[in-house]
Each structure stands twice: as C-alpha cells, then as structure tokens.
Amino acid sequence: MADLAAAWTRLEAAAKVAGEKRIALMFEAEPGRLAALTLNVAGLHIDLSKQAWDEAGLEAALDLAHAADVEGARTRMFGGEAINSSEGRAVLHTALRAAKDADVRAGGVPVMAEVEAVRVRMKAFTEAVRSGAIKGATGKPFKAILHIGIGGSDLGPRLLWDALRPIKPTIDLRFVANVDGAEFALTTADLDPAETLVIVVSKTFTTQETLANAAAARAWLSAALGEQGANQHLAAISTALDKTAAFGVADDRVFGFWDWVGGRYSLWSSVSLSVAVACGWEAFEGFLQGGAAMDAHFRDAPLEKNAAVLIALAQIFNRNGLDRRARSVVPYSHRLRRLASFLQQLEMESNGKSVGPDGQAVKHGTATVVFGDEGANVQHAYFQCMHQGTDITPLEFVALAQSDEGPAGMHAKLLSNVLAQAEALMVGRTIEDVRTELVAKGVSEAEIATLAPQRAFAGNRPSTMVVLDRLTPQTFGALIALYEHKTFVEGVIWGVNSFDQWGVELGKVMAGRILPELESGAAGRHDPSTAALIERLKL
C-alpha cells in the first residue's frame, strides 16, 4: 500500500507540472510523442497524443497502474476468480464472446459448454424466426420485434441495433424501457400484433418497470389474438422459468444467462437475442468476434502498449491529476449516437462509488460524469462551453475512417469537422491572431479591445481520438470491449468494485413504498417536501 500511495503522489506531482504546459508544444519537445501514444488494435486507431500528459506524466500513470497491480487483477478476472467480492461472483462477460473450445472457468468450473449451448439455441431461434419457420398465432411471419427491458437490458441492445441494423431491415426492432405509458403507446402505435414478437428481458423476471411494460404488451397482444394466441408471440431472457411460465412463455422460448454476467455487460449474451433476430446471426457473431479480438489484446499486451490501459490512465490523469470531473464522448456517427448513454451506465454505475471492497472510504476521486451526443450536432449545442467555458472538460471523439452510407461527399465533411474540433480544442486562437483579423477588417481599436478577448480561444483542451476503420460488427464489438476493459482498469486503480451497483437499490425500495401511498392517497412518514408531493400527485 505504501508503494501505491507513493505512486499516487508521483502522479499528482507529474500532473501539476504537465498542467502548466501547452499540449501543442509537447509535440516539439517530445519527438516520439505521436508514435508512443497511437495504437492500432482490432480495426481501431487510437490517438492519445492530444491528451494533457507529458512523458513524465505518462510514466507516472504507468507506474500507478503497476503499483495498483492492474496486471494481477486482469489475470484474476480472466481466470474466473470472484473479483465481484460483494456478491461473491466471478466476472466473465468475456466468456460470452470466447471461442467454444476456449478454457474458461468460473471458480475452477468450465463454462464454455453452457455458453455454447445457449448460443446454439439462439442461432436456431434466430434462423427460424427469420425464415418464417416460427410464425405468429395467425400463421403470419414476424415482421417486428418489441424488446422490453431496462438498464443493461435496454441500453446495450439498443446501441447494438443502431450500429448493426440494415438500412431496410426485413424485421423491424422496437424498444420499450421506461415505465411511462407514452413510450409504450408511441412505440406500438403502428405495429400489427399479429406480426410482432415480444421479447421480455429480465434475469429475475421481477424488474418493476419491465414487468409493467410486459403486462401492457401481453394485454395488447391478447386484445388482438386472445390469451392463447398471445403466448405464441412471447419469448423471454430470464433464469426464472417458473415466472416466465406463469406469464405464458414456453420454456423453449426462454434463454438464460449467468450470475457472472453483470447487466451492463450483458449485451454479448442472450439479452441481445432481439438484435440477432433482426440483424441475422452472422452480424451478431461478428460482434462477438470483435469483442474477443479486443479481449486478446487487453489480456496479452504490455501496459504501455495496451489500448484499454492507456485510455483509462488518460482519464485518471485528467480526473485525479488535473481535477477534471467530467468527460464528453462525441461519436461522429449517427449509428453510434447513443454511445454516451451506454457509457454513462457502463462507467458511472461501475465506478461511481465512494467506498471500496474493504468497506473503507476511497482516498481518491472516482468516476467522472460522462455526457455527450452526436457530432456534428453538438457543435451547435454545448461545444461553446467546451471551447470557451471556465471549466476544462476532456473529450473523446469517435469517428469512422470510411463509410459507404449516404450521399457522396458527406462523410468527408463529417470527418473534417471532427478533426477540426480536436485541433481547435488543443491549439486555440490567440488574442493577437484575433486582433490582426479585426484590424484587417477595419474594426476600431475601441471595439477590438472588447471583441478580441471574446473571440480568443485558450485552447489546451485535451482529447482522445478513436477511429474505426469502418463500422462493422467486428469493429463495433472491439470498441465496446475496449470501453469495458478501460472501465475495469479504472476501478482497479481507484480501488472500487466495478461489478456491483448497490447505489440503485434504495430508490427501488422507496418507490415500492410510495406507489401504494399514491394509490391510496395516504402518505406515510416522509420529509415535508415528499409528503406534500404525494398529496399533490395522489391518484
């Protein structure tokens, strides 16, 4: 622990020095900077050279990773040890994308036979629905799927569908997550129950929001097809066969997954069955292959050449060395527009903790606030704040080197924007440059005195650039696995368990208590504000 404390001290000292430097000038001072801070892995080009660290800062960050035993933690995770200590579980979402003959064990017990058995069932179901061998109650083939889930049972599959969906899908895929009747009504308004397959995703089949939407879906089906007919339009992702049977789902249409798969890591599992059916098995299998390729890199590459480790260390350098408490993720790809929403759960639910596995308060700041949206749209929204705001927010840009979608020339325009933003954030624009421009335009000295400071850009805003060769199932799988491993590395260094989520429980319990109070109109013991709101909102 003394070595770890010393490593933290060195990182903070190095960050203080680097924070006084201009990133743009580091390229001159460090001739090997670009080569040292760019990697090509599994169809991804990753450029960390515009980050705020200098050579000494990078060295201090790597020393911290060694002191925190990232390598040992990595070995324990891939070895199937119960690194989710609060729940006594292994963490093996990597097994879901491993080859069927891989030697993967949870607590010493081989798991790949079970994983492969579920994959075989998923593939058979996918092909049967797509071919029309599995039909609805009226004999019509399924033309739409309604995916019902929330959290990890929604965010991952929804992003996966956006990334992989055909331009003109033969099977449409819709999602319902929120316990808000408006979402269900709007999503199903133009669907035909006779041609819609409903897939309910809940490991325990007890999730309140999901069951409420599932009940609405069943009523919607039953109104058109009858109770027995509705059963033919149901499938489930769950381990609670008794509950799915009671709901009307045949056992051969229930697909499970394991306790060693956390919800936010579950899109590699049967949780994404709806996407496999809508996109085809080949696309889903390619997604798994891309994740496996990134797993191999993360498992085998030394820390100084390890993409997930370096991206994690850049965030730790910004968060803990430079006190940057937020990070903006901006995909310059319409298909990846939900990436920031997915990463909000992955990173903030994993590492948004103030207590470590030993029950003691952590000694350093943990997860940053993640936000973001689609580029170039955000340039006309919050990028004013990114360029000239009082707080410096590191950014992460995600782009595609090539895209065949859309009219000719549009992709080049998109790329020009992402490259310009990253450069502008780093180099900025001096008051002198602005003054020269205004003088050339004949602006008076009095006006220049007020306008020039407003039009200057301080620059020195750090960013990372992640470029996919193309958006394919394989490169998308590699991208998601990269972020998963990055999140794991950060958790190891911060000293938190990245695989539990006790922070979501209290609100669930209190909502369960408040619901009957809203229905009865009799508020229980609450603070004055909540009691008054219950009185105002009672049903």
UniProtKB/Swiss-Prot annotation:
Keyword Isomerase recorded: yes
Keywords assigned: Cytoplasm, Gluconeogenesis, Glycolysis, Isomerase
Pfam families according to UniProt: PGI (PF00342)
Protein name, entry field: Glucose-6-phosphate isomerase
Enzyme Commission numbers on file: 5.3.1.9
HAMAP family: G6P_isomerase (MF_00473)
Pathway of action: Carbohydrate biosynthesis; gluconeogenesis; Carbohydrate degradation; glycolysis; D-glyceraldehyde 3-phosphate and glycerone phosphate from D-glucose: step 2/4
Uppermost EC category: isomerase
Catalysed reaction equations from the record: alpha-D-glucose 6-phosphate = beta-D-fructose 6-phosphate
Protein family (similarity comment): Belongs to the GPI family.
Active-site residue numbers: E349 (proton donor), H380, K508
Subcellular location: Cytoplasm
Main subcellular location: cytoplasm
Any one GO CC term of the record: cytosol
The species this protein was found in: Caulobacter sp. (strain K31)
GO-annotated biological processes: gluconeogenesis; glucose 6-phosphate metabolic process; glycolytic process
A molecular-function term among this protein's GO annotations: glucose-6-phosphate isomerase activity
Presence of keyword Transferase: no
Function field: Catalyzes the reversible isomerization of glucose-6-phosphate to fructose-6-phosphate.
